[in-house]
């Protein structure tokens, strides 16, 4: 029994320290399971990495007319900021779910000063044909949508653990 505990503890210790922390947006940090590839395509910033069990990615998308919104936001009350964020996040999550054709578990969250949504659903993995878990945290950050998503490649407990570790590693300044 002690050997099993030692192995589990060692594995957990190693997996925690093999994480790669990145600042994905001004003041928002996340720990990727491996060093992610960074790219910018059509103004969308993306970080992506894959393990044997999961694909982890982050996308940062500017709000249309972002500069005008940032000027107007200076005069918004906290209630008005929340109202704008909620409206934008509601529309964003509805579009994502409509394009996937799935129903999801959606719950409001707040990370630091940023409003967001936690989204969880199942979908068919096109590579394997297996139904696997997908989970996202979408934050409204300075007139940007920051989508932090993890797609499990299989239904193993290790895949679910990697997904949860990734999504729970989000920190803000």
Where are these regions (language model features)?
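Short, well-structured beta-strand
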Residues: 48-69, 105-173
């Amino acid at each position: 029994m002690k050997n099993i505990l030692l192995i589990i503890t060692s594995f957990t210790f190693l997996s925690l320290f093999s994480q790669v922390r990145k600042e994905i947006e001004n003041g928002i940090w996340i720990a990727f399971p491996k060093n992610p590839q960074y790219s910018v395509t059509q103004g969308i910033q993306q970080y992506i990495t894959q393990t044997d069990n999961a694909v982890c990615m982050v996308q940062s998308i500017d709000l249309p007319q972002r500069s005008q919104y940032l000027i107007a936001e200076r005069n918004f009350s906290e209630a008005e900021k929340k109202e704008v964020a909620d409206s934008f996040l509601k529309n964003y999550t509805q579009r994502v779910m409509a394009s996937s054709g799935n129903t999801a578990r959606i719950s409001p969250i707040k990370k630091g000063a940023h409003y967001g949504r936690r989204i969880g659903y199942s979908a068919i993995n096109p590579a394997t044909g297996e139904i696997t878990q997908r989970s996202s945290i979408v934050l409204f950050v300075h007139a940007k949508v920051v989508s932090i998503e993890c797609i499990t490649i299989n239904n193993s407990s290790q895949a679910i653990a990697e997904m949860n570790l990734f999504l729970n590693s989000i920190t803000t300044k």
